[in-house]
A protein has these predicted regions:
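GAF sensory/regulatory domain recognition
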Residues: 26, 35-63
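Acidic/proline- and glycine-rich, intrinsically disordered low-complexity segments
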Residues: 59-84
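Signal-transmission linkers at sensory-effector interfaces
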Residues: 1-16
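Short regulatory alpha-helical segment in sensory/regulatory domains of signaling proteins that mediates
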Residues: 9-10, 21-30, 36-40, 80
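Signal-transducing coupling segments at domain and membrane junctions
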Residues: 56-61, 89-110, 131
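A short, aliphatic-rich beta-strand micro-motif
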Residues: 109-118
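Regulatory loop-to-helix N-cap segments in sensory/regulatory domains
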Residues: 130-148, 156
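Flexible loop/coil segments at beta-strand boundaries within sensory signal-transduction domains
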Residues: 42, 117-123, 132
Length: 156
């Protein structure tokens, strides 16, 4: 893996292009799919800011479900509620019930979501990445993605 934050700070100047930020994060972590959600202060829901790599055949069905996510629902919602990283090394066979049935249709297997925490300690978003093969993210990768989320927290 390249330096996990490589190129990210440069993309966070001014008004960030969140899709470009996400694509750079995916490249750095050798992942093919990901999302950035922001917590909507008026609804308390995680609102989709951008996504990349969700297969086009499932996007129309999945988009309404990932557009606004309650804390505690799905991988991103669980990361937000728990205020800690949530990962699934084999999303289609998630036996813990974290992944929602429609998420399994993406064919993403290894998935990791980390909360984006603001200066006040509140969850202001979630950064999620995924691989198309079964994958168990190690503690260093989890810490690295959390470091990227900390960079994002200053701008989201």
């Amino acid at each position: 893996m390249s330096q996990p934050t490589a190129g990210v700070p440069e993309l966070l100047v001014g008004q960030p292009d969140w899709h470009a930020v996400l694509v750079k994060v995916l490249e750095n972590f050798q992942c093919v799919t990901g999302t950035i959600h922001r917590t909507d202060p008026s609804t308390g829901l995680l609102t989709l800011v951008t996504q990349h790599g969700i297969p086009p055949q499932v996007l129309p069905m999945l988009l309404p479900k990932i557009d606004n996510i309650p804390f505690g629902k799905g991988i991103a919602g669980c990361a937000a509620q728990r205020k800690e990283a949530v990962q699934l090394c084999n999303l289609p066979e998630d036996l813990g019930g974290v992944a929602k049935p429609d998420a399994r249709k993406t064919n993403v297997q290894g998935a990791l979501a980390v909360p984006i925490v603001g200066a006040d300690g509140k969850v202001i978003g979630v950064l999620g990445i995924g691989k198309m093969q079964t994958y168990d993210f190690n503690v260093h990768e989890i810490a690295d993605l959390s470091a990227v989320a900390a960079l994002i927290s200053a701008k989201i």
